[in-house]
């Protein structure tokens, strides 16, 4: 088979999206010292994710900053998971799975020059997407009254206990956010006059994903001669991976939006997919401007780096991998119009070997030392048990 180029993306939404029903009281009483402060922390921005340095007990840790997490998360087996247990709660993950999880009281955390006291964290199993982090910082930082600003261009996080610290800064858009299960939702215009309430979720690498049911309602009401989006394909698959497992199989619609509105700002040529979970605006928004939170007035401020109108023109997701029942990498979703589909990849295919070397787990697959520009041979077993070879040259996402 001729060598082709393709894009591979593993969707591993490690966000604990919300705390739907709680057995213990939600903690929004993080105390920051010293008082009356404004601190700047240098952050890492890697593959559309925000990583912050945290230290405690003489050790340094790497935490993901995730506004889609209602509070901090630490992983089973980590020293931090041995902190005193304070309660339990019922947690819902990104794939819609529910589980009762333990909540521990973390020791004081040093973030920049600021010490955070009374942080609570849920204890979760370490998923595929969490292999390179020690924990998650959630939106309880803001819910506890701390103002916060993210500036990816300058690679900095600014945090302050001063009331509405960023209110007087110039911002093109000021939106009221509403808390549902302790995480922030804002209203956007994905197309036409459609108003959609979305989770602003920095734990997601996507720019935008829309609830399938909401899209189907909008599709039924569309004007027969005007549609401010293009359906680029439909298929059956699954792509979201949460702490409790993978989302159920379902229909996925591939979209290209003419213009997505965020307050006074608009984003054109946005590729997106539907999801069985809630609609969300992901961390990729931060490529295009700063985001600040003022908890006193529940405001989100967005200031674009350039003009009010931005052409996103992001790549369409053409293939996503999940884990099968035995932990092996499996094609969860493949775009019918994409290169991987033309190569022969199909939903349900299991990756057994790469260049003759066995692939035993999804974690092994996503950490494979691929070299840019090199052709690889995949041994794939389809759902009917047949094996075949697919050659491709990996193009980084």
Model-predicted segments: where are they?
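Bacterial Sec-dependent N-terminal signal peptides
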Residues: 1-25
